[in-house]
Every structure is written in C-alpha cells, then in structure tokens.
C-alpha cells in the first residue's frame, strides 16, 4: 500500500488523512475508551467532512493536552497541520461516492504512514538501548 501523498489534489483525500491523525492522537492520549473517534465519526466525516472535522478538532485539542511527551505531541500537531493545509482553503461540505473513496484512501494511507513512523521510533529506542548495554 502506498503511503500518504501530501501532493494529492483531492481535498477529500486529505480530509481522510486528517481523520487518521485525529484517531492516532486519541489512541496515544487515551488508552481505554468506550468508542473511538473512528467508531463514532468516520461514517459521517466521510460524507460531510466540513460538519464533522470541526467537532473532531475540538476533541483532538483536548487529547493533545493529554499527551505527556512534548516531542510526540508536537509531531502529531505538525502531521495534523500538514493534512489540514493540504485540504486547501475550503473543507468540502459533502462528498460524492467517488470523493468518499478518496477519503478512505487518504485515511488508510495516513494510517500506514503513522504506523511506519511509530515503528521507526520504536526501532530507534531499541537501538539506543542496545548501544547503552554494549
């Protein structure tokens, strides 16, 4: 699967990417939740992103405050900023079926990127521990 493409021309694609970052922020900030952002908002966000992304952004502001690691918090803020900047000047009010597919693609590709970034951070930590033990 390809990774997130910040140069993709579809605003719907970047809306999906923003959704993925919001979900990742919640996952890091709150380990045990009854219903995730994705479970609650994915369907409506993929149809009416202008309405839903504002609500999710408010939740993410709260979740970001809960992330104790300042470096990690800034990484997520920067990723979220990149996704929103790539949307352009207007968040689409509604999405056609084709645009919903681009939303899903952006969501999945950003999830892949975020997981890859996380795996790289874990690998660096493991390597640092190995170096210290030698």
Model-derived regions, located:
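Intrinsic-disorder/low-complexity detector
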Residues: 1-134
């Amino acid at each position: 699967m390809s990774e997130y493409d910040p140069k993709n021309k579809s605003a719907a694609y970047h809306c999906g990417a923003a959704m993925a970052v919001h979900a990742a922020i919640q996952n890091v900030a709150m380990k045990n939740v009854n219903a995730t952002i994705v479970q609650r908002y994915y369907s409506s966000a993929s149809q009416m992103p202008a309405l839903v992304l504002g609500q999710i952004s408010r939740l993410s502001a709260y979740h970001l405050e809960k992330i104790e690691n300042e470096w990690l918090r800034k990484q997520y803020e920067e990723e979220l900023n990149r996704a929103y900047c790539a949307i352009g000047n207007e968040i689409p009010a509604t999405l056609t079926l084709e645009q919903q597919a681009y939303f899903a693609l952006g969501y999945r590709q950003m999830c892949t990127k975020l997981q890859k970034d996380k795996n790289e951070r874990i690998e660096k930590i493991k390597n640092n521990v190995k170096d210290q033990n030698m």
